[in-house]
């Protein structure tokens, strides 16, 4: 138990620096709570002269003064309750936003191995739900005490049972409160819908980044994703504050109206018609105290600790995620341009948890401006080779060089700046076609450059037929486009990037023959004067490659040109015969 308490204390201490920048909100809330407590104390104290002197002996003018004071005190209580609730909600919203942004940035720089081992849904839960729980632990518990401490509606029954004459005042006040609640409820529905939409935007933004993590890494899109997420997270925070403001302001309004019921009870108690009904001091005290008690329910206090512990548990989970190492980026080498020679030297690599290596002592060279194709059965290690070039994974043994420099000596951003990737699984963002193509470049590009890239990729053929052309929003992951169209946008993106090293990872394997022919010319344009690594499923697409490597079980079994490999009458010839005899 002591260990648990210590862990909770340590977790909160670590969380405090996140809360500290917003401590003015906490101070304002605390001051408001002090005045709120003083108002409550004054209300209770006002019962003393009534009980001390006896109900029938109190000067009527004193009761009339007390009626005015009650209204003022309840007004103060309502205002301070609103200030306290709003300030705490402001702090809570800020803490949530900071935690979400920190998690989002951290996830964008995590290695691919991390995403291999963690589901997208779980990560979304960390960002969206767990961060909310952290806010509940830091300030939400106090919000619960303030807000939930304002009501015990059950005391209304006690009031009517004790003195229905005095409690009858509520029949006048009740309809007014009902109207307010109806108006506020309608507003809540509207605000709630807006908040749900914001939650959808937030989840969509995170999901796009997570699903397209390789694209973000390969094209250096972290800044774009960060700005996009900053915007949607702030929109959600502001809409959340509107919901909280509406909730917080409705409480004091109802309380202020209820205070008129208190004043009315005091005035009615001075009337002879009421005085002659044998209204005892005890009955009066019960009715009056019950009205006060409606503003101070305590039943939710027992849940505060549980709420705090849930928040701390979520906080520990998030800190554990933030403590995970991001991609290793220890390289210092930065160059503006490279020639593009890629060399594998005795490279061995194994995936985590796998018994056998995915690559075993691989060595080959892709000279500047040449094309090397990798062929082999599924799972032979072809895609692993491509992933190693961009350092989505790091080699265990051996090394990979770019222009004679170990790729681990380059900074990650600089290495990936020199590489363009077109893969089988094209990831497009829920944005315009123009922005999807321009995603490849870190600096701003002109409309003409985008059009030029689209034309070179033979994408303008279908883009011009769309109603909004380049400004067409294509839906999540390009849902409104065909496979061939999506692939041509990926090629246009790579053309615009204009990197000297090009990786084509089974770029046509998922397309039908007609679509494949449509983009083959685009691929040939893309490969011109570039160092190209092609992972091919269809051998017809790599017959012109300068060298073809046949990969089996992580090793190079054969190498040579198309004609040379056919002449060997080995594994390549068998693959070729299998495809072309069907």
Swiss-Prot record:
Q: How does it assemble?
A: Homodimer.
Q: What is the recorded name of this protein?
A: ATP-dependent lipid A-core flippase
**Domains (record comment):** In MsbA the ATP-binding domain (NBD) and the transmembrane domain (TMD) are fused.
Q: Which PANTHER family match?
A: ATP-BINDING CASSETTE SUB-FAMILY B MEMBER 10, MITOCHONDRIAL (PTHR43394:SF1), ATP-DEPENDENT PERMEASE MDL1, MITOCHONDRIAL (PTHR43394)
What's this protein's family per the entry? Answer: Belongs to the ABC transporter superfamily. Lipid exporter (TC 3.A.1.106) family.
Stored CDD domains: ABC_6TM_MsbA_like (cd18552)
**Binding residues for ATP, per the UniProt record?**
376-383
EC annotation from Swiss-Prot or TrEMBL: 7.5.2.6
Q: How does it sit in the membrane?
A: Multi-pass membrane protein
| Coiled-coil boundaries | none
Provenance organism: Histophilus somni (strain 129Pt)
